[in-house]
Amino acid sequence: FNFEDLSRIPDYPNKNFIDSDDIKNLKDGEVYKYWEKSQKIILQNRKAKFLKTHNILGSINGIPFTKPDYTLGVIHIVRDPRNVITSIKNHFDFESYEKAFQYMVSKDAFLKGEDSARFSFLGTWSSHYKSWMSINPQRRITIKYEDMENNTYDTFKRVISYTNKILGIKKDINNDKLLKAISSTSFEKLSLGEKEGKFKENVFNNNNEKIKFFNMGPENKWKNVLPKDIAHKMNNYYKDDLNKLNY
């Protein structure tokens, strides 16, 4: 793995997928108008393309984020919300866990990048994961973040088997390559690479200071990190979701 490889799976949406004339008049929150147009353009070369997104699988003003005709398959990653909150607090530089929690339960939550094309509608944490899990399992694989940490080899082997299936690849999985991929993407190596300036996707706080992306890693365990009142609130608020996801 090299950090340069991250650019091979670009964020969607972003300005590279939208016509330059459309970009000129684009305002925050209006990128949904170009979802379908941009996805039709992506499909023109008839080659499978991997994209990553934070967007909820839903509609804005009657316009769906994507359609089955434009999506070969989905690798959906879900994470315990009690650990998500720590990452959100760090990423947005929130001053308290309470503010991070209010962000997670807001139906109007969004992510905005450096321009109006990089705008993702999130919704609540609960509605977000449910939206992606509504996809037919034949077109989707759902992976728990915790399984990537605790059962790394088998989890990533499942992902490769899934991508091979939807792409029609019949080759056996190369276990040596898989083990090397896992080794080269350990949290320790990714964190070191970020420290050395190899990671290019950091955000900055209000003081223009770079916020660490590979922040806590395996140390982000809610039982050891969250204030008791927030842990209690989240256990109650997400009780049904936690049971559904076996957390």
Predicted regions and their residues:
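Short acidic/His-enriched helical or mixed secondary-structure segments at domain edges of catalytic enzymes
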Residues: I182-E209
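An amphipathic alpha-helix signature
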Residues: R82-I85, Y153-I160, N175-L179, A231-N235
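A generic structural signal for secondary-structure junctions
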Residues: K89-D93, N164, S186
